[in-house]
Curated annotation (Swiss-Prot):
Keywords: Ribonucleoprotein, Ribosomal protein, RNA-binding, rRNA-binding
GO molecular function, one term: structural constituent of ribosome
Name of the protein this chain belongs to: Small ribosomal subunit protein uS15
GO terms, biological process: translation
InterPro entries linked to this entry: Ribosomal_uS15, Ribosomal_uS15_bac-type, uS15_NS1_RNA-bd_sf
Superkingdom of origin: Bacteria
GO cellular component, one term: cytosolic small ribosomal subunit
Entry's family note: Belongs to the universal ribosomal protein uS15 family.
Taxonomic path: Bacteria, Bacillati, Mycoplasmatota, Mycoplasmoidales, Metamycoplasmataceae
Organism: Mycoplasmopsis agalactiae (strain NCTC 10123 / CIP 59.7 / PG2)
Length: 88
């Protein structure tokens, strides 16, 4: 789980201002940070299927946001992929 401070840093880095949490770039960046934070847990606990459900939900939400961004603003989509080191 990422802390409030980490989330605030992400919002400050990718948002227009420090309260711009609705920006799609910020939402994708926060979900990516949460996903990266949970990966070691599933490597250590491969049978934790209850938590895996929430993990997959985060991945799905990020994928849906990326699909929407690709349809609406392809240049920003490519920027998001490059800055967050995501592959598509």
């Amino acid at each position: 789980m990422i802390t409030k401070e980490q989330k605030a840093q992400i919002v400050a880095k990718y948002g227009a201002n420090k309260k711009d949490t609705g920006n799609i770039f910020v939402q994708i960046a926060i979900l990516t940070a949460e996903i990266e934070d949970l990966k070691p847990h599933f490597l250590a606990n491969p049978k934790d299927n209850h938590s895996r459900r929430g993990f997959i939900a985060k991945i799905t939400k990020r994928r849906i946001l990326l699909q929407h961004l690709k349809k609406e603003n392809f240049e920003l989509y490519n920027k998001v992929l490059a800055e967050l080191n995501l592959r598509k």
